[in-house]
A protein has these predicted regions:
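A cross-family glycoside hydrolase active-site/sugar-binding cleft signature
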Residues: 97, 121-125, 146-148, 186-189, ...
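Sec-dependent N-terminal signal peptides of Gram-positive bacterial secreted proteins and lipoproteins
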Residues: 1-2, 69
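Active-site beta->alpha N-cap acidic-glycine motif
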Residues: 84-182, 274, 290-291
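C-terminal edge beta-strand
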Residues: 5-11, 77-88
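Catalytic domains of cell-wall/extracellular-matrix polysaccharide-remodeling enzymes
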Residues: 130, 152-254, 258-276, 280, ...
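Solvent-exposed, low-complexity, repeat-rich "mucin-like" stalks and linkers
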Residues: 5-46
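Serine/threonine-rich, repeat-prone extracellular segments and beta-strand-based repeat modules
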Residues: 45-83
Length: 298
């Protein structure tokens, strides 16, 4: 009879749990169960201990906050992760946006906005600088000044990525001279889904989509259009009908306030009144605004 000896080796667990989640969006005044948003896995422990520190998250106020999650497995391995929590107002919002100004129509738009206690965003150009004081007025009134293009010449702007950023820098410098601030919100000429850029540089929009973010900008397209770009004489009622035919909770509405767009000014009061009657409020773009992107086609 042989006495057999068996040695047992225990491998030490040194692997931390893995914490994963998408960015968390909650409404103001809500009482979110943050644990339900978070997934924790471990190589050996099926039930790691999870600790959530939400002390920095202020659900009474809109904004972006950091939630700290700590996960500890039975071997004492600990993982910690900060997760972005966006607190949003559940109120239905219209973001009125105006491209191609300033012009003589910009001050008229500002008077209407003031009358209805509404805010808007102006994606400005450098094409009509005798009205640049309207940019200052718009900003002082609580609206957002954003960048569109200095020249609005597609052939120049979209000839190369270098040409695009040269144009963008020009309009940024112009706005900074007026307001003292260099905006970080932009709108591509024609929107990110435009195909006209393909006439001048194949694939440029796909490149710019990432390059603008790398340089600290955020671009905004729209999910509702007034149709006022169709011509310089679109009837006001057509603009009203187009503009009020959207039923999203968050609407980014495209207008133009260049010199020919007198019917846009004429239509604006009825559009604001329509959305007010449906429970919407009017906000300018800010860091808390949902991102509206089209699909890039070039």
């Amino acid at each position: 009879m042989h006495n057999e000896r068996y040695d047992t080796y225990v491998k030490k667990d040194t692997e931390k749990p893995v914490i994963s989640t998408d960015p968390i969006h909650v409404y103001t005044d809500s009482k979110p169960n943050f644990k339900s948003y978070i997934d924790v896995t471990d190589n050996l422990d099926l039930n790691p201990k999870i600790k959530i520190d939400s002390s920095k998250v202020k659900t009474k106020k809109e904004g972006s906050y950091k939630l700290t999650v700590t996960a500890t497995d039975r071997s004492g391995n600990k993982a910690k992760k900060k997760i972005n929590v966006v607190v949003e107002d559940p109120t239905k919002v219209v973001y009125l946006t105006f491209d191609d100004g300033p012009s003589e129509n910009t001050d008229k738009v500002l008077k209407i906005l003031k009358k209805y206690d509404a805010k808007a965003t102006f994606f400005v150009t450098g094409n009509n600088q005798k009205y640049n004081d309207s940019i200052r007025k718009a900003e002082k009134q609580g609206n957002t000044i954003a960048l569109h293009t200095y020249t609005h010449d597609y052939a120049t702007v979209y000839s190369s990525t270098e040409a695009y950023f040269n144009d963008l820098q020009q309009i940024s410098d112009m706005v900074k001279q007026i307001t003292g601030k260099a905006p970080k919100y932009i709108r591509f000429p024609g929107g990110s889904s435009n195909m006209v850029s393909a006439n001048y540089s194949q694939g440029i929009m796909s490149k710019l989509d990432s390059m603008v973010h790398e340089r600290g900008y955020e671009y905004f397209d729209w999910n509702c259009s007034s149709g006022d770009a169709a011509s310089n004489s679109v009837p006001a009622q057509t603009i009203v009908d187009n503009s009020t035919n959207c039923n999203y909770d968050q609407i980014m509405l495209l207008f133009h306030d260049s010199s020919p767009k007198t019917s846009t000014v004429e239509a604006l009061p009825a559009i604001i009144e329509n959305y007010k009657s449906r429970g919407y409020v009017f906000k300018a773009i800010s860091d808390d605004t949902p991102i509206f992107h089209h699909g890039v086609n070039n």
